[in-house]
Curated annotation (Swiss-Prot):
Statement: the UniProt record of this protein carries the keyword Metal-binding: yes
Residue numbers annotated as active site: E137 (proton donor/acceptor)
List of residues that carry N-acetylalanine: A2
Entries under PANTHER family matching the protein: LACTOYLGLUTATHIONE LYASE, LACTOYLGLUTATHIONE LYASE GLX1
Organism: Brassica oleracea var. gemmifera (Brussel sprouts)
Gene Ontology cellular component annotations, sorted alphabetically: cytoplasm
Record-linked PROSITE patterns: GLYOXALASE_I_1, GLYOXALASE_I_2, VOC
Catalytic activity: (R)-S-lactoylglutathione = methylglyoxal + glutathione
Protein's name according to its UniProt entry: Putative lactoylglutathione lyase
Any one of the GO BP annotations: methylglyoxal catabolic process to D-lactate via S-lactoyl-glutathione
Annotated binding of substrate, by residue: R24, N75, H89, L254, G255
UniProt-recorded Gene Ontology molecular function terms: lactoylglutathione lyase activity; metal ion binding
Length: 282
């Protein structure tokens, strides 16, 4: 029992951080061009794996050693995906939303909400879609170390989802936003909201299930001990739901230790060994 109690405390003591979000695109070069020219991201690394028939590109606003980045996956011959109803958006903070919106428009992007103040607040925001139909919220803010600032996913039970992220992943509930007319939002993360990436969990009243599609894949999070972290996830899975989809251990070929699992809403998360991850970047 004491061992279990010690395990349950582990996620809060662990050195956790968001590493990257993985999703699939129909044309890697097209997406890279859009993200670099419209959003100002940089290509950090690329890899092609012909024997598995896929390519990856990692893009972001800073080095992978410190920043959250996107990992784009292109599967040979697959030009489009179903985003589903559960995935919400990514968010980018910028000092000039209007300028970014104009860049998106000039490159043929889809502006779904023109720049303007958020309802009931002072922040200026806009919404745009990339060439694959992924939504990006653009938020006007001062300079920040992490411009790639949100991943929004919809959940069927906010209290359960928050509890899972706290217990299994060691996140903190940074802010809860109640919008009585339509939804409640929980902002989850490892550091303050304006300094780092947050996971925005949205519960729309009365909606308990969403389609996952086949476009969005997973979020990767760093840990100092994959095996210990996996044991905690198993305990929390029993309590709240979800399941391990890949037992803790090294990836063939790479040697990086990971564990992957589904949360109670069916969203996939992957915990990655911090040291192994840094070796991958060398």
């Amino acid at each position: 029992m004491a061992e279990n109690a010690d395990l349950v405390e582990w996620p809060k003591k662990d050195k956790r951080r968001f590493l990257h979000v993985v999703y699939r695109v129909g044309d890697l070069d097209r997406t890279i061009q859009f993200y670099t020219e419209c959003f100002g991201m940089k290509v950090l690394r690329k890899r092609d794996v012909p024997e598995e028939k896929y390519s990856n590109a990692f893009l972001g606003f800073g080095p992978e050693t410190s920043n959250f980045v996107v990992e784009l996956t292109y599967n040979y011959g697959v030009s489009s995906y179903d985003i589903g109803t559960g995935f919400g958006h990514f968010a980018i903070s910028t000092q000039d939303v209007s300028k970014m919106v104009e860049a998106v428009r000039a490159k043929g992007g889809n502006v779904t909400r023109e720049p303007g103040p958020v309802k009931g607040g002072g922040s200026v925001i806009a919404f745009v879609k990339d060439p694959d139909g992924y939504t990006f919220e653009l938020i006007q803010r001062g300079p920040t170390p992490e411009p790639l600032c949100q991943v929004m996913l919809r959940v069927g039970d906010l209290d359960r989802a928050v509890k899972f992220m706290e217990k299994a992943l060691g996140m903190r509930l940074l802010r809860r936003i109640e919008r009585p007319e339509y939804n409640t939002i929980g902002m989850m993360g490892y550091a303050e909201e304006y300094e780092s990436i947050v996971l925005e969990l949205t519960y729309n009243y009365g909606v308990t299930e969403y389609t996952k599609g086949n476009a969005y894949a997973q979020i990767a999070i760093g840990t100092d001990d994959v095996y210990k972290s996996a044991e905690v996830v198993k305990i929390v899975n029993q309590e709240l739901g979800g399941k391990i989809t890949r037992e803790a251990g090294p990836l063939p070929g790479l040697g990086t230790k990971i564990v992957s699992f589904l949360d109670p809403d069916g969203w996939k998360q992957v915990l990655v060994d911090n040291e192994d991850f840094l070796k991958e970047l060398e």
